[in-house]
Amino acid sequence: IHHVKTYTLDVLKYKNIFDYIITKTWLSRSRDEKSIPWHIHACAHISFVYYLNTPPKSHKLKFMNPHHKNSLWLGNKEGKYDHLKMIEEHNEINAETFFLHPPEGHIALFPSTLHHSTESIDGFVGERLAIVGDITCVLKKEYLQFSTGFISPQHWKIYQG
């Protein structure tokens, strides 16, 4: 949770008003050249990937820029027809996607509603292993007066259906 607090407080610049609940985790295993399609984690606030094993040419983690604020024309995507595009060099300012090649032992933290996927790389051999999970931010007890934000499940009343 230390990294999540650092991300929330120092990177995103939120106030220190949250407790953090890991709501689910799973093991991600990639053994072939199949990619994971674009998706979000709608039931969480922060998602994480902790890379246990990253062989050479293992999948890259891709993120989609949902705003395209610096795109002058639609259709200037990165891809196999780059020679037909108007952009000299894709970077974090003009690209609609960006990616990471996370090293072993790296943890990636990102907003759960940020579209993301994985993309395989030709020649990948081996198995990429990662622990993946979702975190929900809940208001600390002394900050329940905020009109938005989740309250801790300890204050919930659950009715069995």
Feature map (PLM): residue ranges:
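Catalytic core of non-heme Fe(II) oxygenases with the double-stranded beta-helix
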Residues: 30-109, 119, 126-127, 131, ...
